[in-house]
Amino acid sequence: MAKTWKDNEISLDPIKDQTIAVIGYGIQGDAQANNMKDSGLNVIVGLKEGGKSWKKAEADGHKVMSVAEATKQGDIIHILLPDMIQGQIYKDEIAPNLSEGKALSFSHAAAIYWKWIEAPSNVDLIMVAPKGPGSKVRETYLDNFGTPSIVAVEQDFTGKAWDRTLGIAKAIGSARAGLIKTAFKEEVETDWFGEQADLCGGAASMVTNAFETLVEGGYQPEIAYFEALHELKLIVDMIQRYGINGMWRRVSETARYGGLTRGPIVMDAASKANMKKVLTMIQDGTFNNEWISEYQSKGSEAFDQYMKQNDEHQIEKVGKEMRKMMWPDSTE
């Protein structure tokens, strides 16, 4: 069994006198910085000067400064920037101001694991990765609970890296829900696999194929949209709350028998073999090398062509009209 921690097993004392420099103020940076501040830690925010994030962080009551200055002042440098800009900002602003005994902290380990950032040996390398979006991290904290996190130490120069890691996790509220020990390698490879094979890539492809199958079978696109896409959330919510068998116990007998006997026809051994191919391409660096090459040569255009194709698909056109009906006041 994996090592776990709960809130009452952890103290903030080891980091209460340290300065936490949050680098970046996007969805995770905003949530984690505010949670740590509300937990009584000394938080500063490092940002590019003059941007919207700077003004927002100041409005939220934070002491805001350049990334370079935040690195100088911080004891724990908590990097919450988008993956693809971490390497350059580290090289230009963080590395020149990083001194012995500080900690580089992350919520995703890709930059260290794939060596986009090559950290020195005289700092701690730690990770606190909430298993949910920043909005949920903040929302659950304010509800006096939290979003669970997986935590890891890659390099313990000071001998206090775990105290720092667990302190950050407690301060953002994650320890209230529970912490699970992992490793940088495991976090990166499983996170990317989840995104590609089921959570984003696999789920989107499955839904699209189901929609196309119904429409090609002569059914109305609007009905196909409900069956293939809209109702998925109801099932996922049950699986998340009660487990897979808990979901089966809460659907109709017809759905239970049909799903149990036909699901393996849809997701068969060939599907699992393809998942293994995806995992292998992550493990051996194929995906990382492809993604870096594509991003460096094309930037966001690396995925724009795929997004454009999706925008032109019937499921998107029908979906926009269906969502207007169900959420008339919302904008997309």
Give the positions of each predicted feature:
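NAD(P)-dependent Rossmann-like dehydrogenase/reductase catalytic/cofactor-binding core
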Residues: 222-332
